[in-house]
Amino acid sequence: MTRVKVCGITNRSDLDTAVDAGVDAVGLIVDVDVQTPREISPQQAAELAAATPPFVTAVLVTMADVPDAATELVEAVRPDAVQVHGESTPDALASLGAAVEADVIKATDPGTAATYDGHADAVLVDSLDESGAGGTGTVHDWDRTGELVESLQSPVVLAGGLTPENVADAVEAAAPFAVDVASGVEAESGQKDADAVSAFVDAAGGCQ
């Protein structure tokens, strides 16, 4: 069964919406070098992480420098996992993983995903901008991601331009460990739509 992460949770209402829809993970965006309505403060993220119920993974999503700044942020927010965007070496990721009690996910593009295989608990394959940030809302080559699923040891999370309308095709093409969505389930920028979240979860799971 492909797991589902809804990223860019900014408030308790949207957290409840995602949990009620049956998501497996929620993303809390803190300390990123891009303008996004989904970014929240470390304190807000810590409150939402603490409110996330058992069996739902709270994921800190950040561009903080690895390992030092990212380690401090993980200690402040106390998530179940940390998803790292931007430039970082495999050794830096390993240092982060050794320093925190959280799984480490590396966001990357299809061309560089293999670099981080085995150095992170999972790799998230996204359509990244020049800064290494995701959230572009752009679809990439799902067949290429499927090849990574077959060749990498690390679990592969598929992100980039996913919606309730196309996620079933994406899962069929790539068979990822999980799919990740943000803008594709929003009624307006930064605000989740309950119907869209439920439809996304149903579509991602219905094609198994």
Curated annotation (Swiss-Prot):
InterPro entries: Aldolase_TIM, PRAI_dom, RibuloseP-bd_barrel, TrpF_fam. Pathway: Amino-acid biosynthesis; L-tryptophan biosynthesis; L-tryptophan from chorismate: step 3/5. It catalyses: N-(5-phospho-beta-D-ribosyl)anthranilate = 1-(2-carboxyphenylamino)-1-deoxy-D-ribulose 5-phosphate. It is an enzyme of class 5 (isomerase). It comes from the Archaea. GO terms for biological process: L-tryptophan biosynthetic process. Its EC number is 5.3.1.24. Keywords: Amino-acid biosynthesis, Aromatic amino acid biosynthesis, Isomerase, Tryptophan biosynthesis. Belongs to the TrpF family. This is N-(5'-phosphoribosyl)anthranilate isomerase. The gene is trpF.
